[in-house]
Amino acid sequence: MQFKIIKAWKVEFIKNNTGDGGAMKEAFKQLKPDEIPIHSFTNKNGRMWGNTSPKNLLKMIEKNKGLYEVIHSFPHKVYFDIDKHEKDENHLIKVKGIIQTYFPDADMAVSGSITEEKTSYHIALQNYVIHNEDERQTIKQIAKYICENEEDSFDWKVYTQNRNMKLINQSKPNKPVQAIIENDDYKAHCITCFINDYSLPIPINEKIEVEIQIEKSKKDDILT
């Protein structure tokens, strides 16, 4: 049998039972319109994928279950993944200032961890939303521009379909927990659900627009 079913936390998870993979795609086949896909990675069960309601997700993330959101479809909140490879307790001030420059009036929910070796943050914006692939590529180019010109702790490679983003109060096996830093509302930290009906338009300055057009021309050259 290619897959193994594990029932946990009111979710039926699918786990690879062979080296052929495919558990994530199998979970997507069972995804209902009112559910979101999730991924769990623990020492006990390894990697497994499933689907749950946003309401149940809030209960699940109260304790560490190694849970991740799988960013599988649109819409979802604009998010940033920040990784600085040293301890810097003041880094968040700089990062938030940069985000506010590109996303005026951004309402942020911040989680993360700080160790002697690394400073990490996930930042979800409550009032900026990605509705389609073009907007996702725009956010990617903004993050890339920031990384290359202003602050290299911005990870611009996290804007892909089926990207796994660690949820609050969760951790990889034997790693620091993704702790709430700003905004105590669990809903605010979820990227793929609890999305506001109203959002601000994604602003694009001239420099970013040039980068977007260059990237599009590269893709057009590949297609032709």
PLM regions and their residue ranges:
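DNA replication initiation on ssDNA origins
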Residues: M1-G97, F154, V158-Q178, H189-C193, ...
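N-terminal structured subdomain of primase-like DNA metabolism proteins
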Residues: E215-T224
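Short secondary-structure junctions
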Residues: I38, D105-V110, A179
